Amino acid sequence: MRKKRAIFIDKSLDTAIIISPSKYFNFPETPLGLTPEGMHVPIGREVCWAGFPAVSPKNLCLFAGRISCWLEDERAYLADGVAINGVSGGPAFHIIEENKVDILGVVSAYMPNRATGETLPGLCVLRDVKQLQKVVKGLSSFESAKAGENKPMSLSANKPEQD
């Protein structure tokens, strides 16, 4: 039996997408939105991210910080918050109006303070949601996602990676 998931990996962006038919999960009636294409979350905006940190792997934890800058070349945000081991790959959110949030990206890494070599304080790297939008737009069904996963996909180019 084939696995009921499709995986798209982009090693250069430290990003992956796992697509699974909704019948296997209790998804909300209205899913969270993605930050619109071409929009950047403003510097200073409060953001949060979720994950299962290695220090408490059975508990979903929420972390918060503020956008420090936008890195155009990396298509990523730096946020002044901690992303401890185990949180990478988790979603990052921002509030767009009362009781409504959008996904702005994915937790990718934590950059320690290079001046002192200390782990804290540091910056969290949040990869932009654009890579996810490209993959989702290119899919018409779960079957098309499954067919496209035979080789790891480059999310940035939306084509198979070369070995």
Region locations from a protein language model:
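Serine endopeptidase catalytic core focused on the charge-relay Asp
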Residues: M1-E72, L104
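Short, solvent-exposed secondary-structure boundary/capping segments
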Residues: I17, E74-G81
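Short intrinsically disordered coil segments
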Residues: P31-E37, D80-A83, S141-F142
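Short, well-ordered alpha-helical segments in soluble proteins
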Residues: G51-A54, L71-E74, I96, Y110, ...
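Conserved short-loop catalytic and cofactor-binding motifs
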Residues: V55, D80, L120
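Short glycine/serine/proline-enriched coil/turn segments at secondary-structure junctions
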Residues: V55-N59, G86, A115
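Catalytic nucleophile loop of clan PA
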Residues: G81-V107
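C-terminal cap/linker of serine protease catalytic domains
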Residues: I103-D163
